[in-house]
Design a protein with these regions (language model features):
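Catalytic loop of short-chain dehydrogenase/reductase
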Residues: 87-110, 114-123, 136, 197
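Alpha-helical segment proximal to the catalytic Tyr-Lys
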Residues: 76, 119-120, 184
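Short C-terminal tail/terminal secondary-structure segment
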Residues: 176, 187-247
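A short, exposed helix-loop element centered on a Lys and neighboring polar residues
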Residues: 71-72, 115
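Substrate-binding pocket helix/loop in short-chain dehydrogenase/reductase
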Residues: 47-48, 52-60, 152, 156
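Short, small/polar-rich loop/turn modules that mediate ligand/substrate recognition or access, typified
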Residues: 37, 122, 127, 186-188
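C-terminal substrate-recognition "lid" of short-chain dehydrogenase/reductases
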Residues: 68, 164-193, 198
Length: 247
């Protein structure tokens, strides 16, 4: 039904030794390591003044340290001699990340780490890039509560020129491109997949978008509860607009 085969390895990506062992196991089992996607991460909403030292450290280790460990081991154990492609995950952190300052600090580090590695490891035929998702519909949104879930998440689409949020498939497509030979001369790039949200300005009000359609290639994808009402109405309006255009 889903196609392909997957091999699972349990690993705490914040633990250096576990990461070393995981990369070694992958190479032993498959005989090579062509590509690495650092897609593990996480954070929690909090004002800066309320973040404890442990909380800040946990988010930075989960997003930045783990990325470094995996990049380094993939390079040292395989890619230094054979080449390869690495894709890291950041976020739209260029304008700051109010309410998630710990995550913004870590993601900014990932962006710079990507650029540094692309220069240092280019001699080995290793391309290193990064994807910076904007506001993406995912099950993780249901992990938030309070005002963040009630007011902030439902308001996000209104701040995107395409007037919608992205899908997980649209992020995966960007990752697949950067991993592929089609991007053989692309390295040191952080690709923003955000519907141009990062280019907006309050001086220019956004008009309604009538022809913005998403790509969703995951048959198991589902709408998080916090967005079901909003997305249901948007899909209905989109269908009505398409029917009107046909007429």
């Amino acid at each position: 039904e889903d196609g392909g085969k997957v091999h699972f390895i349990v690993c705490d990506n914040r633990d250096e030794e576990q990461v070393k062992n995981m990369i070694a196991e992958v190479i032993e089992k498959f005989g090579k390591l062509d590509g690495l996607v650092n897609n593990a991460g996480g954070q929690f909403p909090s004002a800066l003044e309320s973040i404890s030292a442990n909380g800040f450290d946990a988010v930075v280790r989960n997003n930045l340290h783990s990325t470094f460990y995996l990049m380094r081991e993939a390079y040292n154990q395989w890619m230094a001699k054979h080449g390869g492609s690495i894709v890291n995950m950041a976020a739209d952190m260029w304008g700051g990340m109010p309410g998630m300052g710990h995550s913004g600090a870590a993601r900014s580090g990932v962006d710079n780490l990507t650029k540094t590695a692309s220069v240092e490891w280019g001699r080995s035929g290793v391309r290193v890039n990064c994807v910076a998702p904007g506001w993406i519909i995912s099950s993780g949104m249901d992990n938030y509560s309070g005002d963040f879930a009630k007011f902030i998440i439902p308001s996000l689409a209104g701040n995107v020129p395409l007037k919608r949020m992205g899908t997980e498939s649209e992020i995966s497509s960007a990752i697949c491109y950067l991993l592929s030979d089609a991007a053989a001369f692309v390295s040191g790039v952080t690709l923003r997949v955000d519907g141009a949200a990062s280019q907006g300005t309050r001086m220019y009000p956004l008009a309604d978008a009538s022809n913005s359609h998403s790509f969703n290639g995951f048959h198991r994808a589902f709408i998080p509860d916090v967005l079901k009402d909003q997305i249901g109405k948007a899909e209905q309006q989109s269908a009505q607009a398409q029917d009107a255009n046909k007429d």
